[in-house]
């Protein structure tokens, strides 16, 4: 099934640029059981149910919000078969009034470029990478053909940056290396691919200052605010949101790990110019997705 937009972007209140589909339509989980348990413990999720695509869609539909949905193909590095991206795209197509699918490819597999092309043909609107889980340095030129294919399709690429809850608390972090998610590696990619829109996912602790500098320096680089409640944002990031990052920051939760209602409540408690809110919650995401920003009549 091919995805096409069915969203009334003028009517929705927010675009969450960062949500995970944990379980595919076949009941397969995106991580193995040990990693699932550790991740849920890290985020203090308790009995919160795993999110399938249809459940996620209804959750956002009830809140008049749109969700970008994805999974992560890290089979080579993690030894765990990924969720079906075709299943995710089909689920987004069923719920195209509220969901936007991003693709995923394993950069370490020879068919990565071909997989990009296949998923573009199915209608994905961007691609998600997790360098630490996928065990690759984004600025290694071996992976540049992947970015060439994404750039040629006119789509954005979203990269995990900074600390990760995946593997946290386990011996050796389950083998996951944080250095792959240093945003300075993406500075190289952004310079070498000026026509590729890049989103750095999460406040990139412990590299937040570098992340702010990169987003401010390069017009093709944005950052999303997922993975943390806004009340835990580093103070320099909060300052930047009202200044140099007001047109570069995107609303994102990391759902189901961070719930939308909690994130919005904590964001509203920040001392920010009210004019910044519509930029972060919707308008900046529309620009990243290559969509027009609706104007309000009157």
Stretch-by-stretch model annotation:
Residues 1-17, 24-58, 62, 66, ...:
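Mid-to-C-terminal alpha-helical segments outside catalytic/metal-binding sites
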Residues 14-24, 158-162, 200:
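Histidine-centered catalytic micro-motifs
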Residues 18, 119, 127, 150, ...:
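Conserved, mostly hydrophobic/aromatic
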Residues 22-25, 74-77, 107-111, 163-167, ...:
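Active-site environment of divalent metal-dependent phosphoester hydrolases
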Residues 31-38, 45, 77-80, 167-180:
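Short, flexible/disordered intra-domain loops and linkers
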Residues 59-60, 119, 150, 189:
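Generic structural signal for hydrophobic
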Residues 66, 74-168, 177:
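Active-site gating/metal-coordination segments in enzymes
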Residues 125-126, 140-250, 295-296:
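Catalytic pocket-lining loop regions of alpha/beta-barrel enzymes
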């Amino acid at each position: 099934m091919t995805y096409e937009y069915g969203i009334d972007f003028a009517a929705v209140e927010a675009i969450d640029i960062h949500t995970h589909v944990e379980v595919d339509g076949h009941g397969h989980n995106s991580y193995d059981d040990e990693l699932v348990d550790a991740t849920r413990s890290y985020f203090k999720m308790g009995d919160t149910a795993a999110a399938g695509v249809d459940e996620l869609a209804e959750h956002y539909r009830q809140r008049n919000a749109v969700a970008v949905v994805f999974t992560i193909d890290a089979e080579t590095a993690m030894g765990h078969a990924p969720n079906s991206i075709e299943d995710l795209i089909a689920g987004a197509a069923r719920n195209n009034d509220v969901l936007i699918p991003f693709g995923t490819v394993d950069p370490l597999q020879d068919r990565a470029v071909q997989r990009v092309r296949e998923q573009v043909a199915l209608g994905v609107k961007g691609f998600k990478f997790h360098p630490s889980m996928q065990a690759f340095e984004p600025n290694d030129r071996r992976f540049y053909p992947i970015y060439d294919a994404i750039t040629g399709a006119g789509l954005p690429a979203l990269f995990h940056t900074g600390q990760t809850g995946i593997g946290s608390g386990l011996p050796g972090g389950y083998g996951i290396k944080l250095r792959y998610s240093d945003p300075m590696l993406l500075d190289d990619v952004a310079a070498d691919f000026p026509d590729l829109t890049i989103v750095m996912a999460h406040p990139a602790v412990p590299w937040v200052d570098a992340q702010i500098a990169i987003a401010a320096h390069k017009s093709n680089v944005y950052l999303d605010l997922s993975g943390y409640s806004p009340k835990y944002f580093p103070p320099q990031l909060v300052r930047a949101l009202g200044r140099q990052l007001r047109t570069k920051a995107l609303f994102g939760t990391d759902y189901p790990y961070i719930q939308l209602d909690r994130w919005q409540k904590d964001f509203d408690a920040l001392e920010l110019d009210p004019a910044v809110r519509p930029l972060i919650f919707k308008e900046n995401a529309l620009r990243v997705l290559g969509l027009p920003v609706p104007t309000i009549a009157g």
